[in-house]
Amino acid sequence: MERVRQMFSCVSGMIYRPTDSIAEEYHKWYYGNFVWNTTTWMGIKCLKSVSDMWNYQEILIELEPSLVIEFGSRFGGSALFFANVMMHIGQPFKVLSVDISHKDLDPAARQPDILFIESPSTAPAIAEQIRRLKNEYPGKIFAILDSDHSMKQVLAEMKLLQPLLTAGDYLVVEDSNLNGHPVLPRFGAGPYEAIEAYEREFPGDYEHDVAREKKFGFTFATNGFLIRK
């Protein structure tokens, strides 16, 4: 029993570190209790913060993009969410959702306006597919990165999108709350560090949408609401 208590204490310490910030404490509680792991859209898992999802629909309504790019499909709930919001906007659109494996994809997520592709997100074929969709659905782009959370992968995805996004397009880098920002301090370099590395290399590409990031008090996309300049 003592060994179990020690193990639990170790795991809890990785997830929860008290601070004086109420918002940060709530963030840690929300993440550490896996609320995000039981969040669904129309019955399909999303694995997101509900306040982030609300923020995304506000961004989509304001931006009125014609193309939504999602790296990381998993169950398909978020792709369906984006498609449902886009249908309300009422203009031609496509949601491109890419994942290295669609074994967990819920069949109910498959809709005519969503193109699911099983592939590494950084494959040249994905960049080419995005170019084709840009021609077919001209206009603004909303892109969101939520696949492998390693720094290397996220940085590669940001670089893949660099020549494909233009001024006014929107990029969200999710799970940048990992590695102590403020959850899972021992995770290792992840999305947050990828954003920092990208901005060191390409300092003029993005403006941070701080108002969006701070709107609901916490976000899983810490430092990751980006508007292309």
From Swiss-Prot:
Matching SUPFAM superfamilies: S-adenosyl-L-methionine-dependent methyltransferases (SSF53335)
InterPro entries hit by this protein: RhmsylMtase (IPR054932), RNMT_CmcI (IPR007072), SAM-dependent_MTases_sf (IPR029063)
Alphabetically ordered keywords of this record: Lipid biosynthesis, Lipid metabolism, Methyltransferase, Signal, Transferase
Superkingdom of the source species: Bacteria
Pfam families (alphabetical): RMNT_CmcI
Any one GO molecular function term: methyltransferase activity
Transmembrane segments annotated in the record for this chain: none
One Gene Ontology CC term in the entry: plasma membrane
Keyword Metal-binding applies: no
EC number: 2.1.1.-
Annotated signal sequence range: 1-23
One GO term of the biological process aspect: methylation
Family recorded in the similarity comment: Belongs to the rhamnosyl O-methyltransferase family.
Protein name: Rhamnosyl O-methyltransferase
